[in-house]
């Protein structure tokens, strides 16, 4: 099986390409990726657990907690079990929560116990009956709670969303000013694949001229080089955060316990 929830950035499947195309038409301030997990697991909602990628802003982190507290209020009132700050991190860029996050939104995963084994009703390991209605009701409740708290904070959400992109086009995000991809004839197909990927993700690029100095991915050292006719991806652009996440040579990792994928830097591909 192919997991489309790991294909947001790469868009190798037609379903992913159509989904991201629609996403880019709307560019939401809030995006929730609804899932189901093992039937014995209680409901999961934000905030996520570490590691968080360092491009995630303090506002994005803070508002995840604000949303989680609003959900908890409703779940506590109903006596529904839930957990937060466990299992699901915000690191790998191709999930349905991180991809929106790296594009300025508050991106979150919500997980309901059930899955294919849930059926119309099932008895879990605790001896409780979990019905399809229960599962739908939990997702319905977090949906309305998300809308409610987002509406209450609409002004701040829009302000911070605008700031995210204003910062991207004024100063850029990250320590590197630009990324250079050598446009060697022998790598023609690989370069074309990269440019196709950049286009899919709305990342701007151009052709270089002259010489410069920077980090060499192959040697791991700072070197002088010519970049005439090479591909140059400027870090100062609307998708600056996504550029940093996809191209930086080494992402910071504050916790070695991650959900799964930890390596993806495009220049090494």
What do these predicted regions represent?
Residues 6-7, 12, 18, 22, ...:
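Intrinsic-disorder/low-complexity accessory segments
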Residues 36:
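Detector for the c-type heme attachment site
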């Amino acid at each position: 099986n192919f997991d489309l929830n790991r294909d947001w950035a790469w868009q190798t499947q037609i379903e992913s390409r159509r989904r991201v195309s629609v996403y880019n038409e709307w560019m939401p301030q809030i995006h929730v990726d609804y899932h189901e997990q093992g039937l014995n697991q209680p409901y999961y909602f934000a905030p996520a657990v570490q590691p968080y990628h360092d491009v995630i802003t303090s506002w994005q982190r803070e508002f995840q907690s604000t949303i989680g507290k609003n959900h908890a209020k409703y779940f506590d009132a109903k006596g529904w079990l839930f957990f937060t700050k466990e299992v699901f991190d915000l690191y790998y860029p191709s999930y349905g929560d991180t991809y929106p996050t790296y594009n300025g939104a508050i991106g979150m995963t919500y997980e309901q116990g059930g899955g294919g084994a849930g059926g119309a009703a099932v008895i879990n390991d605790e001896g409780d009956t979990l019905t399809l209605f229960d599962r739908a009701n939990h997702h319905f409740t977090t949906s309305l709670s998300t809308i409610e708290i987002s509406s209450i904070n609409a002004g701040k959400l829009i302000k911070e969303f605008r700031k995210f992109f204003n910062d991207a086009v004024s100063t850029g995000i990250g320590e590197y000013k630009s990324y250079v991809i050598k446009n060697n004839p022998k790598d023609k197909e690989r370069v074309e694949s990269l440019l196709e990927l950049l286009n899919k993700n709305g990342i701007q690029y151009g052709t270089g001229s002259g010489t410069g100095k920077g980090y060499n991915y192959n040697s791991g050292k700072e070197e002088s080089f010519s970049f005439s006719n090479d591909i140059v991806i400027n870090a100062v652009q609307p998708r600056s955060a996504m550029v940093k996440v996809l191209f930086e040579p080494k992402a910071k990792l504050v916790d070695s316990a991650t959900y799964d994928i930890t390596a993806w830097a495009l220049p090494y591909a």
